Regions:
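N-terminal secretory signal peptides that target proteins for export/translocation
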Residues: 1-15
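Short linear/disordered segments characteristic of secreted peptide precursors
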Residues: 8, 22-23
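Cleavable N-terminal signal peptides
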Residues: 23-24, 34-35
């Protein structure tokens, strides 16, 4: 019996290719910028970003949502809130946030509130900081469930039953940034959105499309406006100490 010393040419080729692939992957990772973790600092003379998000042209003609369950309480139909446009074209329920800010004010002390009310979620759109939590409750005398999912993969985060009016529970949010889609399986028209960010510099537009972000450290930032149907658009803002930077972002209906 003869022993086999050394590797065959095929094995040697495999080892060389695998080593090259590993080196290439490490080089690619090293070339990507690494964002610093958010640092909480005292903001003594911060500025404010104040602005409005508008919808270009006329809002799409959305038809009322047909109610398929609990009509005795929810009614026969519910207005579709996807495009809610106020005076002057102001667009409601747009999440506006600063991009890649690495230090500033502390996270909100209180959990988010997500209420099942009148067979809809309220609020429909809101921001959150990674590491936070959400208080889920129901003001309706019908069975709801609150089912948040990763918006990209549809993976379930958890699924909470709310069996009666006044029921509430507080749950942690995922530990990484991203968009969360919330639905009620019992009432398929019920949707909400939570944008988890690594910092607390975000706001949701009101009925007139207006938003305000306070206590911003001086600097130049990219401001992002995100809407569930119209997509997102960015603006550049320069924040000076103790001053207010104005912004107007216009989205187009899709």
């Amino acid at each position: 019996m003869h022993s086999r010393i050394g590797a065959t040419p095929r094995l040697q080729s495999f080892v060389i290719c695998a080593s090259a692939a590993i080196v290439g992957a490490l080089a690619l990772l090293a070339s990507r910028p690494v964002l610093a973790a958010y640092e909480t600092v005292t903001v003594t003379n911060g500025g404010t970003v104040d602005g409005v998000v508008t919808l270009s042209g006329t809002a799409p003609n959305v038809v009322p949502i047909k109610v398929t369950k609990n009509q005795d309480y929810c009614g026969a139909s519910i207005p579709d809130p996807t495009y809610t446009v106020g005076a002057g074209g102001g667009l409601e329920n747009v999440l506006v946030y600063l991009k890649d800010i690495t230090k500033g004010k502390a996270a909100p002390a209180e959990p988010l509130a997500l209420v099942n009310e009148h067979c809809m979620f309220s609020p429909r759109v809101q921001g959150a900081m990674v590491g936070g939590s959400v208080k889920i409750s129901s003001n309706d005398p019908v069975l709801h469930n609150t089912h948040p999912q990763n918006a990209e993969t549809n993976a379930t985060i958890y699924n909470i039953a709310l069996p009666f009016k006044g029921f509430s529970v507080t749950k942690p949010l995922p530990g990484s940034p991203g968009l969360i889609k919330v639905k009620c399986d019992a009432h398929e028209w019920m949707h909400a959105w939570i944008m988890e960010l690594e910092h607390p510099y975000y706001a949701t537009t009101g009925a007139d499309g207006h938003f305000t972000i306070k206590d911003v450290p001086p600097g130049t930032y990219t401001l992002v406006a995100w809407h569930e149907a119209a997509g997102e658009k960015s603006d550049s803002v320069v924040v000076a100490a103790g001053q207010t930077a104005k912004s107007k972002i216009t989205l187009t209906a899709k």
